[in-house]
Design a protein with these regions (language model features):
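A mature extracytoplasmic/lumenal domain signature
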Residues: 41, 52-54, 73-75, 85, ...
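Extracytoplasmic/periplasmic, Sec-exported soluble proteins
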Residues: 25-33, 39-42, 104, 147, ...
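Hydrophobic ligand-binding cavity/cleft-lining segments
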Residues: 1-65
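Short, surface-exposed coil-to-beta transition loops
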Residues: 23, 77-79, 107-113, 126-128
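Short amphipathic beta-strand and strand-loop transition segments with alternating hydrophobic
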Residues: 11, 80-84, 111-120
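Solvent-exposed loop and beta-edge segments used for protein-protein assembly and interaction
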Residues: 22, 31, 87, 121-123
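Glycine-rich portal/gate segments that line the openings of hydrophobic small-molecule binding cavities
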Residues: 60-109
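Terminal "cap-and-tail" regions of soluble proteins that handle hydrophobic small molecules
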Residues: 1-5, 113-189
Length: 189
């Protein structure tokens, strides 16, 4: 893993990946079949609905947009996320977000590129996530670099906690999909 190169034909992606303010990497395992993992990555709005159904924390508010999703995080992060590449054993997402927090100036915005790569084995996914973030102005970039240690710890904590909730959801999707269909009131999933 670590070999997936995002689509750098889009200049904003090349800028984020080529000159990030911070980069976070995490290897992880999921006890789920590849088809379930890929469908989860390919349907972020549906996953947001399931996240809400399970009352996972943080309680993200997820709405669908023309080309992806809009996410409001109760801790003050608001952003848009869209998939920019779908390759065998990899997905790449691009996001742009702002922070709405009393301690962070309103002009603090950042772009991010998230690359998920994985290897398949029967019933197990060995994956890696790489999150590259770049501040949208020199002040944002300077603050992100200055507080990179704190930022990385917060990203790791959030990613790890979200991953635990995701494991429960994916397990139920694979082993008890009717529970989710009934909870969402949909039979088409």
């Amino acid at each position: 893993m670590g070999s997936q190169t995002p689509d750098v034909r889009e200049p904003f992606v090349a800028e984020v990946v080529g000159n990030p303010s911070v980069v976070y990497r995490k290897a992880f395992f999921l006890e789920v079949h590849t088809e379930v993992w890929e469908k989860a990555l390919d349907n972020p709005f549906l996953m947001g609905q399931i996240w809400a159904l399970y009352r996972c924390q943080p309680a993200y508010q997820v709405t669908q947009t023309d080309d992806g999703i809009h996410i409001v995080d109760p801790t003050g992060i608001t952003g848009d996320l869209r998939r920019i590449e779908r390759a065998p054993l990899a997905r790449v997402f691009y996001g742009r977000g702002t922070f709405d927090h009393w301690a962070i100036p309103s002009f603090f915005t950042a772009d991010g590129v998230i690359v998920f790569e994985w290897k398949e084995t029967p019933g197990l996914i060995a994956a890696e996530a790489t999150i590259s973030m770049r501040g949208n102005n020199w002040i944002s970039r300077a603050v992100m670099k200055l507080f990179s240690g704190t930022l990385m710890r917060r990203i790791d904590s959030r990613f790890t906690n979200n991953l635990e909730s995701l494991r429960i959801i994916l397990s139920d999707i694979e082993r008890n999909p009717q529970k989710i269909r009934e909870g969402l009131g949909r039979e088409d999933i």
